[in-house]
Amino acid sequence: MEPEPEPAAVEVPAGRVLSARELFAARSRSQKLPQRSHGPKDFLPDGSAAQAERLRRCREELWQLLAEQRVERLGSLVAAEWRPEEGFVELKSPAGKFWQTMGFSEQGRQRLHPEEALYLLECGSIHLFHQDLPLSIQEAYQLLLTDHTVTFLQYQVFSHLKRLGYVVRRFQPSSVLSPYERQLNLDASVQHLEDGDGKRKRSSSSPRSINKKAKALDNSLQPKSLAASSPPPCSQPSQCPEEKPQESSPMKGPGGPFQLLGSLGPSPGPAREGVGCSWESGRAENGVTGAGKRRWNFEQISFPNMASDSRHTLLRAPAPELLPANVAGRETDAESWCQKLNQRKEKLSRREREHHAEAAQFQEDVNADPEVQRCSSWREYKELLQRRQVQRSQRRAPHLWGQPVTPLLSPGQASSPAVVLQHISVLQTTHLPDGGARLLEKSGGLEIIFDVYQADAVATFRKNNPGKPYARMCISGFDEPVPDLCSLKRLSYQSGDVPLIFALVDHGDISFYSFRDFTLPQDVGH
């Protein structure tokens, strides 16, 4: 069976409108790609006619494919102009669907990066001009791909990812958080004050309104504090507040030492006097006794007990001085709530009980220490720890710790084999981003080129707020040197918590590599 005759080749100059005959010939030509492989590759030329014929046929198919010209509908093309002095492509007509994930606006004009324009030109979406002359794909490759714009390797990776459906944007160094922002755990994507509609978010309460509320609260409390400073005489002690609300500390009363301000209710009579705290005697100078340190006695301060075995379930109303002006306190009986508490003991297996029993042997209750109980503040507790540390250092044997060469560990530090290995290990665990902040000033070598977003995010992708990338891409050629450790640390620090991927291009074949952290296992049982 004879093969069908192929239509005559029609050479059409770029940008010219086709006639009916030329359009029919261009549309009726074969749309199949040439065969990529013609059998196994020969190791050496043998000079045979069959081998020469296979080579000739492969070359003809390749040149025929390269010489084939694209025919597109003129009305569906977006006119664009290449501006080499500015390094971008400016659109002359409204953009199409590609504008959702590609391009940027500047000075009220729609513009494309060179790699985006070249990709759209290959896809048949734009009509590119330069100096009012249409450009072919070959001419666009020569003009748009330079060392000052985008290299050929970078465009190969860009077009490869775009054909796979990913959203590819240029990497913005300004999106890298500073060391101070990373220390505060600030995320760049959270710093934007725009919501889904592009409008600025309104906070629930502005600082001005907060200041007004605080000022109104101070004004409402000020008359009460003045009135409480000079209480009127009364016959019933239960109706007279025994505390002064303008001070947070307990104040001295006429009949006894002090009473806790934060008690749940006013206690009538002197039966509650002297309950709460005691004062140490201060120094007396010129007949005036100085204020001593307060010592709270928490055994005598009644806190609400909500346990089911509690016999006192009636909670008194709080003092009116502790409540806002428009809030009234009342007594509450918590008996019904105490009966609803779940008092079932946790059921543990035998292995869990043994594990808890073994762990309890090495646990010490800090609150059971008498010296700790005598501490009334964090400052005294820290001073106690410091004194104990000095005492332990003085007990060390001088023939071991008084020499230039000392032991690696003290007996108190050897709590487990894992702790001993951690202290005596020479190689410490490290990560690639560690120490990368001081390497940011060093330039040269590999750089992050593209931010890659997943293909399923195209429908919801927004260029003004793209969010966190799926990966960041570094591009290198097969004949280029392998990146050193400084470059890897610098790039990993720039990438942050976004995975860093290296694209290696070998004559059109693209491979992707990445570095992952791993932890070596430690045998702490021997």
Curated annotation (Swiss-Prot):
Q: Which residues are annotated as modified residue Phosphotyrosine in the UniProt record?
A: 180
Principal cellular location given in the protein's record = nucleus
Q: Where is the composition biased (Low complexity)?
A: 220-229
What GO terms describe the biological role, i.e. biological process, of this protein?
mRNA processing; tRNA splicing, via endonucleolytic cleavage and ligation; tRNA-type intron splice site recognition and cleavage
What's the superkingdom here? Eukaryota
Modified residue annotations for Phosphoserine: 178, 267
Recorded consequence of changing residue 85 to V = Found in familial late-onset hereditary ataxia; uncertain significance
**Omega-N-methylarginine found at:** 316
Q: Which UniProt keywords apply?
A: Acetylation, Disease variant, Methylation, mRNA processing, Neurodegeneration, Nucleus, Phosphoprotein, Pontocerebellar hypoplasia, tRNA processing
UniProt KW Phosphoprotein keyword: yes
Positions bearing N-acetylmethionine:
1
Location of region: Disordered: 27-47, 192-290
Q: Please state where this protein is localized.
A: Nucleus; Nucleus, Nucleolus
The record's section on InterPro entries has: tRNA_splic_suSen54 (IPR024337), tRNA_splic_suSen54_N (IPR024336)
Question: What does the entry list under GO cellular component?
Answer: nucleolus; nucleoplasm; tRNA-intron endonuclease complex
Taken from the record, one Pfam family name reads tRNA_int_end_N2
The family note in this entry says:
Belongs to the SEN54 family.
User: What does this protein's UniProt record list under function?
Assistant: Non-catalytic subunit of the tRNA-splicing endonuclease complex, a complex responsible for identification and cleavage of the splice sites in pre-tRNA. It cleaves pre-tRNA at the 5' and 3' splice sites to release the intron. The products are an intron and two tRNA half-molecules bearing 2',3' cyclic phosphate and 5'-OH termini. There are no conserved sequences at the splice sites, but the intron is invariably located at the same site in the gene, placing the splice sites an invariant distance from the constant structural features of the tRNA body.
Instruction: Quote the subunit structure annotation.
Output: tRNA splicing endonuclease is a heterotetramer composed of TSEN2, TSEN15, TSEN34/LENG5 and TSEN54. tRNA splicing endonuclease complex also contains proteins of the pre-mRNA 3'-end processing machinery such as CLP1, CPSF1, CPSF4 and CSTF2. Also belongs to a complex containing isoform 2 of SEN2.
Which disorder is recorded? Answer: Pontocerebellar hypoplasia 4: A disorder characterized by an abnormally small cerebellum and brainstem, severe neonatal encephalopathy, microcephaly, myoclonus and muscular hypertonia. There is a severe inferior olivary and pontine neuronal loss and a diffuse white matter gliosis. Pontocerebellar hypoplasia 2A: A disorder characterized by an abnormally small cerebellum and brainstem, and progressive microcephaly from birth combined with extrapyramidal dyskinesia. Severe chorea occurs and epilepsy is frequent. There are no signs of spinal cord anterior horn cells degeneration.
Protein name, as recorded: tRNA-splicing endonuclease subunit Sen54
User: Which taxonomic lineage does the organism of this UniProt entry have?
Assistant: Eukaryota, Metazoa, Chordata, Craniata, Vertebrata
What gene name is given for the protein in this entry? TSEN54
